[in-house]
């Protein structure tokens, strides 16, 4: 199955299920088909993977899954088994979500700063795949961007082991040259020459603000080569946690992917962006270097505040 859609995979405020349903509806409207649930702030997916969600949360999740199914959107779950001794708890968590209709699971080993071992990770991954042969799994390595390879000797050794030993038929996530890449195309995979393009799933953090909360990247996907996203079996855009912005991003993604004739300005107006701010919208595009005059700064301040 070709998966194109979004990731709820950022640090920060977790949206409500009603807000998630709106994202699902927008994905469906644009012919996009995938929503990965993997918020960093959900402790039951990461640090406390051995503890179940509450019954009330699970009821809301069941309703969310039913809505997604009605909209022909698949929901995947991202699980981060930080501790090796939690493999049985991980299996139990997967079984619980599988019983609720989830077929796609991402096993995430990102953002681990110490005591990480590729061979321990792949052992866990294989154990999970062996346990659930009828489900779909992919993998996120600890080194998931080009800039992380040379972070230190441990990261260098990890990437060497990953490059040599990760099964070539399996799918894994990559964010490009940077954790937040401002250019995305075939050159974003230059460190992955030994892997097929279809094995490299993209986790696109361009719009994500959790690691840089005072900065918002916004453009009509002009950082992304259309032939690149179209060549992918899995391309997911990470959202921001800001509901209006996230709905705007989904609208832009759908229009860009389908190459619709809808203009950037039309989409911005549809989502209630002030016409005066649209005149200055390139301020949010990192490719465009803008030197603001004082009167422009004053104008933007009046619009925003």
Model-derived regions: residue spans:
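Generic structural signal for well-ordered alpha-helices
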Residues: 20, 24-25, 61-66, 90-95, ...
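Residues that line or immediately flank small-molecule/substrate-binding pockets and catalytic motifs
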Residues: 39, 109, 239
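Conserved, mostly hydrophobic/aromatic
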Residues: 27, 97, 107, 128, ...
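Catalytic-core regions of glycoside hydrolase
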Residues: 9, 93, 103, 112-257
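Active-site-adjacent "subsite" loops/lids of carbohydrate-active enzymes
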Residues: 74-116, 219-222
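Feature activates predominantly on carbohydrate-active enzymes
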Residues: 1-86, 100-103
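C-terminal functional modules
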Residues: 257-305
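N-terminal cationic-hydrophobic initiation segments that often serve targeting/anchoring roles
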Residues: 28, 65, 69, 98, ...
């Amino acid at each position: 199955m070709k998966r194109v859609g979004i990731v709820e995979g950022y640090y920060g405020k977790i949206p409500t299920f009603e807000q998630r349903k709106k994202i699902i509806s927008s994905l469906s409207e644009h012919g996009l088909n995938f929503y990965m649930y993997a918020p960093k702030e959900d402790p039951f997916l990461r640090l406390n993977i051995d503890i179940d969600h509450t019954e009330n949360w699970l009821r809301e999740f069941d309703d969310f899954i039913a809505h997604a199914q009605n909209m022909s959107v698949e929901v995947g779950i991202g699980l981060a088994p930080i501790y090796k001794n939690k493999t049985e708890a991980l299996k139990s968590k997967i079984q619980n979500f599988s019983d609720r209709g989830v077929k796609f699971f991402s096993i995430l080993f990102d953002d681990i700063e110490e005591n990480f071992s590729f061979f321990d990770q792949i052992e866990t991954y294989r154990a999970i795949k062996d346990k659930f042969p009828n489900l779909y799994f992919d993998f996120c390595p600890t080194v998931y961007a080009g800039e992380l390879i040379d972070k230190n000797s441990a990261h260098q050794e990890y990437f060497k082991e990953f490059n040599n030993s990760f099964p070539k038929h399996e799918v894994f996530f990559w964010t490009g040259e940077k954790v937040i890449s401002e250019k995305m195309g075939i050159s974003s995979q230059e460190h992955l020459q030994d892997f097929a393009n279809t094995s490299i799933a993209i986790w696109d953090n361009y719009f994500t603000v959790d690691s840089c909360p005072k900065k918002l990247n916004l453009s009509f996907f002009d950082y992304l080569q259309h032939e690149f996203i179209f060549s992918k079996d899995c391309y997911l855009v990470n959202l921001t946690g800001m509901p209006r912005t996230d709905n705007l991003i989904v609208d832009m993604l759908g229009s860009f992917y389908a190459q619709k004739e809808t203009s950037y300005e039309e989409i911005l107006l549809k989502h209630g962006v002030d016409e005066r701010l649209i005149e200055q919208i390139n301020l949010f595009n990192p490719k465009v270097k803008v030197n603001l005059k004082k009167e422009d700064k004053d104008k933007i301040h009046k619009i925003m505040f």
